[in-house]
Amino acid sequence: MSIHLSVLGSGSAGNSTLVSISNQDNGQPDRRPFNLLIDLGLSLKQTRLRLEGHGVSIDQIDAVILTHLDQDHLRPVWRNTLQAHQIPVHIHQIHASAASRILAAETIVSYEEEIKLESIIKIRPVQLAHDTTGTIGFVIEAHSKRLGFATDLGHVPNELLEHFVDLDAIALESNYDPDMQRAADRPAFVKQRVMSGHGHLSNAEALDAITRIAARSNLDHVVLIHLSRQCNCPEVVSRLWQQQAPDLHARLTIADQHAPTELLQLGPPVAMAELF
């Protein structure tokens, strides 16, 4: 029994992550995994291609959960596909009204507290600051394994640190390098928004948060997501972690805008043939 995670793409041009959860039991040994997508910010074509690289098709997506409704996390083009495949989209109630103007009503599942999917999956949300409408982080739990996921958060509140305990893996935004942000050729109001505490996390803020979370977890994987194309680069991020958190650096994966990460496993090894 295991959880697999792949960030299909992450950045200002689009975000989507596959979480594939082993769904076998003694009565149904050949049952395929439960496939969950976090966010729908990539094009249909790119999502299909990147899923197929992991042996998953669109019609094998069982559910979607959204962090928030910015277009790099939800593209309106998904509306008809979600309807056609009858894929439920779980949306926190703070975003549900706005989502109804983008998605078909019958695909929207509004929630406030914990979500239970199948009999084995629990998703516990936490509200976070981002621009005016906020964003939602999650702990996804199955088979006694726990994945923490949060992106587009302006700062790391105590509520998130209290929520993200006993994790086996974490995916957290590491959006910008402050020096690159200040030097960037972009309007001052954009820089202020990003760095305001209601915009995005810097590399140092992400490292500090994950270091604190790691002290109360047993992390197999650390995945950094939503790197700014203009104000960050993987080399800067990797160097920071090598210098300040070398033990965690060995478990580090930096997500890319243009290619999916490998399937990262939480739990005991499972042969790929058994998964898909």
Residue ranges and their predicted role:
Residues N158-D256:
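Cap/insert and terminal regions of metallo-dependent hydrolase folds
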Residues S6-T17, T67-P76, A96-S100, I123-P125:
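Structured catalytic core of nucleotide-sugar glycosyltransferases
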Residues L37-G41, I61-D70, H90-Q93, G148-T151, ...:
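Active-site neighborhood of phospho(di)ester-bond hydrolases with catalytic His/Asp-centered motifs
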Residues P33-F34, S43-I91:
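Active-site metal-binding motif and surrounding structural segment of the metallo-beta-lactamase
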Residues L74-H85, R101, N232-R239:
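Metal-dependent catalytic neighborhoods of phosphoester/phosphodiester hydrolases
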Residues I91-S144:
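Metallo-beta-lactamase
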Residues G9-S10, L40-L42, L69, L128-D131, ...:
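Active-site metal-binding loops of divalent metal-dependent hydrolases
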Residues M1-H54, I136-T151, A169:
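Conserved beta-strand hairpin/beta-sheet module of binuclear metal-dependent hydrolase folds
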